[in-house]
Amino acid sequence: MSTTRGVSSSSAAAALALLLLFALCFFSFHSAAAARAVPRDEHQENGGVKAVAAVAADQLVLQLEGDTGNGDEVSELMGAAEEEAAACEEGKNNDECVQRRLLSDAHLDYIYTQHKNKP
């Protein structure tokens, strides 16, 4: 009778190990399938360092192609923002300026209120 109990416990341990292996495989494949690929742009096929912005439903995906940057990307972005601000002060593209300001204000409001406790 002791041999039956030993076989029973070893088969239960094997079944438990098989179940854990199955669960591990399921979750690893499920997480890989849940990840979505970044959209490709037709200009990326040439190579080099290129920035591609793709606007999704609620997010902005910025993809840089190449090994490393030289740090001038942020400076270039800041320069573009300063040029847009100067154009707004001169009165050019008034509708675009108002729309940009409203969007930036709404975005800041969202950032500062998203983690606050609601009454």
From Swiss-Prot:
Keywords associated with the record: Developmental protein, Differentiation, Growth factor, Secreted, Signal, Sulfation
Which positions carry the propeptide annotation? 35-109, 115-119
Q: Which residues carry this modification: Sulfotyrosine?
A: 110, 112
For this chain, the family text in UniProt reads: Belongs to the phytosulfokine family.
For the keyword Secreted, the answer is yes
- GO BP annotations, alphabetical order: cell differentiation; cell population proliferation
Question: Care to name a GO molecular-function term for this sequence?
Answer: growth factor activity
The protein's name: Phytosulfokines 2
Where it sits in the cell: the answer is: Secreted
Where does the UniProt annotation place the signal sequence?
1-34
Q: Its GO CC terms?
A: extracellular region
Tell me what gene encodes this: PSK2
Name the species this protein comes from: Oryza sativa subsp. indica (Rice)
Family annotation (InterPro entries): Phytosulfokine
Q: What is its main location?
A: secreted
Describe PTMs of this protein.
Answer: Sulfation is important for activity and for the binding to a putative membrane receptor. PSK-alpha is produced by endopeptidase digestion. PSK-beta is produced from PSK-alpha by exopeptidase digestion.
Tell whether Cell inner membrane is among the UniProt keywords: no
